[in-house]
Amino acid sequence: MRIHFIAIGGSVMHNLAISLARLGHQVTGSDDQIVEPSKSNLREAGLYPTEIGWNADVITEDLDAIILGKHADADNPELIKAQELGIKIYSFPEFIYEQSKNKIRVVIAGTFGKTTIVSMIMHVLKKLGKDFDYVVGAQLEGFNSLIKLTSSAPIILIEGDEYYASSIDDHSKFHYYHPNIALISNVHWDANKTEVSEDVYLQQFEEFIDTIVAKGTLVYNKEDVNVLKVVGDTKDCKINRHGYKMPNYTINKGITYIEVGEEQIPLKIIGKQNLSNIAGAYTVCEWLGIKRGEFYESISDFKSSIRYLEFVKSEEGSVVYQDFAHTPSKLYTSIHAVKEQFSNKKLLTLIELTPYDILKDDKLEMYRHSMIESDYAVVFLNKNSIKEKNIVLGNVVDKIFSTFDHTNMTVITDFDELNFYLEQFESQGFNLLFMSSDSNIGVNVLSFADKFLAKKVKNFK
């Protein structure tokens, strides 16, 4: 096939383009901005556009298909030309479905935990030597791409999210996959992440359940109230239903042990959310024919997905974790996980907030007491980003202090100041948790960890 990507530079889109080229398709693409690592990956694959920007002339009648990225607007000149010529236009999820019609489609959905559950299943299947394709939203250890598509693998694992498919299609992406096995980990409406109402948000998950193929299977978290609601509201669907819940566990000397029958299996991950994720991953693997012993032997050495409550470094009894999390509920959950795991250690938590998080008072208000379990709390706001949004820095700093309502809070707006703070902080007896909505606020987390863990004179008591 001759396939053209409109908005080829996205993290998932450029991986799909490279995968299709490797399968022998003729692939081209356009974008108005391409950054790393997409730029280098596309250049290495010989798929980097000859010019940056949109050009309707590249859309010709001999194209078999257009794959439209979310980044492209409805008035994109290449899109308009393709519509005029009647070329078949696919959104990303539509195309993935077309390529996986003859496979067992396993789709993992939920507000939180999708990437982690998919990566757990991938880890187990890989260790057991199973052949499978996958589509995941973040780079995972042991896998060199976000997408693997082949003609031979009998199974495809898909991280399915609830956001719209493209600029000309407001259906949720996960409505297109028609899973044989689906999992919903949780359903949590968050005004910081979506502009739709809570009812509309929950409805997307009900419609997702409706798309499960006849006699397919829904795996769901029995401990999530909203999951139970959407499952109950779709009781007429002719599918199998298999609920799961968090397993029993113990923590000893900073290591979590999961109870499996009479055995205590040590894990390399922490937090109740991850334990629930393991239960969900195991249930899916059961439906794929994996035996219990095989699963737990394989999962015991699973490490967190990259930047999802991920261990960074430890020294002299102190540990540093990082987490791709900035919404109020995830902030609270991740802090609780680290505090529970290391209950005898004090915790310093650093959260980066973006201008979007603080633009509206009602969104900021949702953070109230979200860091209450952390002994010290630091909110980082990049003052340059704040200025670009014409926000008065002093006003927003005052609001942050008032809203978070934390007795040991510091608000920092400058990178140099943040470096100095970490260098001066007495880390003995403390752990550190980095939390960010972006790429770790543009810094090297390992470097920050070194500054925090370095021996220094006591400044805090």
Model-derived features: where do they sit?
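Phosphate-binding loop of NTP-binding sites
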Residues: S19-H25, R43-E44, D57-E61, K70-Y220, ...
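ATP-dependent carboxylate-amine ligase
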Residues: M1-V35, L42-P49, D62-I66, A82-I87, ...
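Short polybasic amphipathic segments
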Residues: I255-V260
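Short pre-catalytic strand/loop immediately N-terminal to key active-site residues, enriched for Gly-Thr
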Residues: I265-I270, S318-Q322
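Fold-independent oxyanion-binding glycine-rich loops
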Residues: I8, S30-D31, G69-H71, F92-P93, ...
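Well-ordered beta-strand scaffold positions
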Residues: D161, G261-E263, S318
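Beta-strand->loop->alpha-helix junctions that form or flank phosphate-binding loops
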Residues: E51-W54, Y90-E94, V135-A138, T234-K253, ...
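A generic structural signal for residues located within well-ordered alpha-helices
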Residues: T116, Q273-A279, H326
